[in-house]
Amino acid sequence: MLHRLVRHILQPEGVFYTMLLHRKSVELLAPAGTWEAMTAGIAAGADAVYLGGKHFNMRLHEGDFNFDDARLKNAVDYAHAHNVELYITLNNLISNEELPALREYLAYLNEIRPDAILVQDFAVLELVHEMGITVPLHTSVMMNTHNEHAIEKLKEYGITRIVVGREMTLSELALFRARTGIEVEYFMHGDMCISESGQCIHSGVLFGQSGNRGRCMKICRWPFALIDEETGAVLDADSPGPYKLALKDMCMYRSIPALIQAGVYSFKIEGRMRSPEFIARLVSTYRKAIDAYIADPNGYTTDEEGWRTLYDNRVRDYTTTFAFGQPTAVDIGMTGEREPRFFSQAVEEAGFADEVLRAERPMEKENAPSRHLSVRVGTVDAARAAVDAGADTVYVGGEAFRPNRPWKLTDYEDLVRYAAGRARVVVNTPRTTMRRECGELEQFFAALNDIGVDGIMVGNLGTLKLARTLTKLPVQADHSFNIFNHLAITFLKENGLTMATASYELSFQQLRQIVENAVLPVEAVIHGAYESMICDYNFPAMSLPNYSDLAAPELLDRLYAFRDEAGGVHSIRIDQYGRNHIYFAKDLCLYPYLEKFSGLGSYRIEAQDYTADVTAEIVRIYRAALDRLAAGGDGYRAAEFDRLTEIAPRPLGIGTYRFRQSRNSI
């Protein structure tokens, strides 16, 4: 008989509860990309397996992997016959043209009765409710769930388990678990992304193959040089290697007690593309360790033979990433020596290769507003410049990139007075809102009610819930919501939002389909510097021996960048929370094609990385072009386009609009 451990966890209100730790207190969750891998994982001791169909999941590169519909049913039956649960991944973004197939697939999954479906796209939540689907729902890690307010919102839609964001420490996770009571799944072994989940768009924009749609080309495994952006000088010549973003593989084998005591229920192994033998080895090794701890926690010690098995059969070297604190350079495989496969190599980003875009018909939307121009800025001076140049809305606040400082309450008050009668002032919020950010936002939102701003831009479900609870201001969704279809916008409207910003990864066709079917106005970015990924890592600190939070100001405020092998320079901007925002090498510019976007609810300029003077000139040019279009004329002027090119701090291009569509999920 198993010994049982009584574990006490402090609840927020100060009440203790007890949980008897036994064999079913922890789930060992194995991946399966083939029938053989599934049966091997089950035979080795997995409590549950997760796998994907031939479409709508995050592992679509290999045609020989994943399960067709008939095999899915057989897999469910096989797992249940062996008293093992089976979860099906439906965890990528779904475009409008794929929605009919999604309906059919959901109906089929409801028939074959897996134990849960893993989801990312809000459209799935909408359809599950509409269709009466009764299969339990778990959030995918791609939903980037990282605060308790998002959990409370997701519970309203029947979510019973979350795969937590990889950036959470175990101490944060324990508090998170205690406050929400939600079941927690945690990636504890395997390949990890260096970007925050769901917030890397590099592959989708560059190759038309979105990491959010199961086709990541792994730009993070490219070699890069760290440079001084202003001088071009290489700063990391003494670095162990050029693979600055190549995170090592997660391995929590030596930390199983810490995982269990943090309240993790499901121990998730990554590896749906791995062989049956590889999966069996991992599962059996972790099975023995978990069972040994549960049987006798006080007498438990790491089985070094098991560790030797994992170490000798590793793909990359191992790391615990954020489990016990901020990762450092030792967590990155900079030499690239153990990298098993390179999916792509550096190429130049798209310029104005616009044959596809020029051939498209314009958007059509009844009652579309008359050329509303919004501008996101980084400083008070840039905000005033945007107002003076003719912006209808300015987005202010949120992340502040060094050397700029965060906005103060008095800055908002002054700008509201300055813009009165000329432009709306909408407050931006950080894209990522962990415990610190949420605490700060609660106080900030309470103050906003008296300042007179015109609205709030939110970047995740938790911030949405806070804004709707603590203010009476209009709330709109930023591009970080990864809006890829009109049903996701329906979801946002049901939750009180007034406008949604489209994903950067959409092609023009896909954006047009959303705009023409959406129940809310849709905003799209038409010009500006935009981020390829956001990372909770400090890349300058990883490469520069003298760099730390206590470094000299000239080191902290220097502008850093990564240079890829194609010569592209990717700016690195560090915000007040220490996160690193990596930019594309070319800024987006859709000036020559504005007439195509006539159905938009708002045309947006991303000027957060621009000076006040550059911001003013860009806004004036777009204001004039949009006004000409509104009057029925031609918006384009060659001299204006030339001027945009001259003043741009980076080369210009059209990003994902070079593609007819982001490669599909079916």
Where does each model-flagged region fall?
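Short, intrinsically disordered low-complexity segments
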Residues: L2-V6, G271, A585
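Active-site pocket-lining/capping segments in soluble small-molecule metabolic enzymes
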Residues: Y17-T145, E172-S266, M273-F491, N495, ...
